[in-house]
Amino acid sequence: MARVCQVTGKGPMVGNNVSHANNKTKRRFLPNLQNRRIFVESENRWVSLRLSNAGLRVIDKIGIDAVLVDMRARGEKV
């Protein structure tokens, strides 16, 4: 699935552009996705992930091993 964080599941949101005259038109708010290669010491290999900034913070907080266990439990291929 495109434009979705593999760690947090964050995807695009829908909202409005609001002009000075208060006219509203639909727009999409896209997550801040980055492609990152992260080294997993326990598996001695690199893992490529498409992450939002929040996903990077989750990895910093709980560690890549815990994140990979959670992703595999959801059935995501890593």
From Swiss-Prot:
Name of this chain's protein: Large ribosomal subunit protein bL28
Coiled coil (residue ranges): none
Domain of life: Bacteria
Cellular component, GO, one term: cytosolic large ribosomal subunit
PANTHER family: 39S RIBOSOMAL PROTEIN L28, MITOCHONDRIAL (PTHR13528), LARGE RIBOSOMAL SUBUNIT PROTEIN BL28M (PTHR13528:SF2)
Keywords: Ribonucleoprotein, Ribosomal protein
Lineage: Bacteria, Pseudomonadati, Pseudomonadota, Betaproteobacteria, Burkholderiales
GO BP annotations listed: translation
Family note: Belongs to the bacterial ribosomal protein bL28 family.
Listed Pfam families: Ribosomal_L28 (PF00830)
GO MF terms, alphabetically ordered: structural constituent of ribosome
Gene transcribed to yield this protein: rpmB
